Amino acid sequence: MQTVLENPELSVEQRVQYIQQAYERTKDKTDILVPRSAADIEKIEEDGTLKYKWPKFLGFNPGYTAIGEGTALPAQMDRYGHAGGNNFCSIPEAGAYTFLQRALPYLENSAAYHAWSFNGDTYLAKIEAVRQQDWNGLNGLLASEGLAPVGEAECIRLTKAYENYLRTVREKIGADFSAPYGVTGTVASAFGSDGGADQWTMPLSAALMEKLGILY
């Protein structure tokens, strides 16, 4: 598939059609997300990476806010896609938001859906420890919850992930917007969908937040 994506002699439409056909033939669709339409793709990079026409401001409607002490954190979160991502939706009492409310450019795939409970009690303290690179403090929090400590390699991963998050916020929202603990708001309309879901962009990925006992 990657060879086809990297082939500049094929149009974007041809390459997307190939991806969709390969997806339909795939039996195990776990965490596979493929484009719904070639019209949603800005370009295909030389290495075959798909660059979508994502809306501005990390996909938030105007009115997004920085997560902080006064934020009502969700009891549950979910997302479509692998655990390396850091964009989530809360889960309302009435049930999860629809694919259209999330305004995603992919074919809907239930095998790519994941949901977690969210531990808000120590969330801010854990993110602050990562922010300050206070690994003793972080490990103290983890120990208080019966979780394994983070080692040197994990500390490096946490630092890089957090720095990447801050860089993304600066690039996509602006250097004057401070959101050390994440951003929350509603999903902007995009890809032919109205959006409207309650969205959370967190400093760490799902996988890292699982490690820290934030998601479980």
Task: Indicate where each model-derived feature is located.
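Catalytic toxin/effector domains delivered as secreted proteins or via bacterial secretion systems
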Residues: E13-Y216
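Extracellular, luminal, or virion-exposed ectodomains of exported proteins
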Residues: Q2-Q17
